[in-house]
């Protein structure tokens, strides 16, 4: 049975997600509608991707009875409102990361999903890459002994990109790209809550974080260090150090296509796109789409690999890191 997708927002990430879906069998995934705030944008997107229906409002997409799941690709300050719209209309939802602006909003999203009895997942696509599944497999077999230290960094030169630096657009390094480093640590430590969170950072004149370093202390003398910046390109690697070896994730750690396990490299290539992409390795979004289909067909309301609890913990940690650095969004006081 084909999962029928609706695409919410006709922006860059929605383009890449739609291209990624096309790398999967048509009898399993079909994009049947797209909605944008301007009909012309939706129509242009629909034409480019051969999508049968285009809507000039998200409400029309929510009312379309022939949609199984909606992919939400709007900027993150809109995730809560748009997510609630679709879930209240009994639509399953795959929502871009961060799921919402803070823990309070994330909890509202989760409550709405439970109330409407629909599937909801934060689109932390990294977790579903074959390389990430291999990391989890290796760790479950104690391939590097007891993990003592995890390091992850993600930096990109995004100071000229409004959505990365403007507060009302949800800008800031942590929510946009630092989230990948934090989620990586939580993946390694199986969703365990850290005992201590220490964050330091520097802020732009707009009031959002230009760069942040977050240190997480876990039980059993385990540490993690996450570094993110929107001011410059970093090595964008991740490292897991155990008592008996190391796993290195070379660039690009948020969409990994290779692993170095004790110095031995294994490649995990992603498929080629049929249209040009906006972001690197975006066809790897196919893996999260496969997980959504698996869960929806099985009647599951969340994925065990990126659960509601995982999203809540991620938001909780980022809230505390922002509090320490002094990054406050309007959503924090609502």
Curated annotation (Swiss-Prot):
Record site feature (May play an important role in catalytic activity), residues: 180
UniProt-listed Pfam families: GFO_IDH_MocA (PF01408), GFO_IDH_MocA_C3 (PF22725)
Enzyme Commission code: 1.3.1.20, 1.1.1.179
Site for May play an important role in coenzyme binding, residues: 71, 79, 97
First-level EC class: oxidoreductase
One term of GO molecular function: D-xylose 1-dehydrogenase (NADP+) activity
UniProt catalytic activity: (1R,2R)-1,2-dihydrobenzene-1,2-diol + NADP(+) = catechol + NADPH + H(+); D-xylose + NADP(+) = D-xylono-1,5-lactone + NADPH + H(+)
Keyword RNA-binding belongs to the record: no
Keywords from the UniProt entry: NADP, Oxidoreductase
Family (UniProt): Belongs to the Gfo/Idh/MocA family.
Protein name per Swiss-Prot or TrEMBL: Trans-1,2-dihydrobenzene-1,2-diol dehydrogenase
Organism listed in the record: Danio rerio (Zebrafish)
């Amino acid at each position: 049975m084909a999962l029928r997708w609706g695409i919410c927002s006709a922006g860059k990430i929605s383009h890449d997600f739609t291209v990624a879906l096309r790398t999967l069998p048509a009898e399993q995934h079909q994009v049947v509608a797209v909605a944008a705030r301007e009909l012309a944008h939706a129509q242009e997107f629909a034409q480019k991707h051969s999508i049968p229906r285009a809507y000039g409002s998200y409400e029309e997409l929510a009312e379309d009875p022939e949609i199984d799941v909606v992919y939400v690709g709007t900027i993150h300050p809109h995730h809560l409102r748009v997510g609630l719209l679709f879930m209240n209309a009994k639509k399953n939802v795959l929502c871009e990361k961060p799921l919402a602006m803070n823990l309070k909003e994330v909890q509202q999203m989760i409550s709405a999903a439970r109330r409407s009895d629909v599937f909801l997942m934060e689109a932390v696509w990294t977790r579903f890459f074959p390389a990430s599944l291999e990391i989890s497999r290796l760790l479950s077999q104690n391939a590097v002994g007891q993990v003592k230290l995890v390091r992850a960094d993600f930096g990109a030169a995004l100071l000229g990109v409004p959505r990365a630096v403007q507060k009302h657009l949800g800008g800031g390094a942590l929510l946009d790209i630092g989230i990948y480093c934090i989620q990586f640590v939580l993946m390694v430590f199986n969703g365990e809550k850290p005992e201590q969170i220490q964050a330091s950072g520097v802020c732009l004149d707009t009031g959002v974080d230009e760069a942040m370093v977050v240190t997480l202390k876990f039980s059993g003398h385990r540490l993690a260090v996450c570094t993110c910046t929107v001011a410059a390109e970093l090595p964008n690697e991740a490292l897991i150090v155990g008592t008996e070896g190391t796993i290195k994730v070379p660039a690009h750690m948020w969409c990994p296509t290779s692993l170095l396990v004790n110095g031995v490299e294994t490649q995990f290539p992603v498929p080629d796109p049929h249209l040009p992409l906006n972001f690197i390795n975006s066809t790897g979004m196919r893996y999260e789409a496969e997980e959504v289909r698996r869960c929806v067909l099985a009647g599951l309301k969340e994925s065990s690999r990126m659960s509601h609890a995982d999203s809540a913990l991620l938001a909780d940690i980022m809230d505390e890191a922002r509090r320490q650095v002094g990054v406050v969004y309007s959503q924090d006081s609502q």
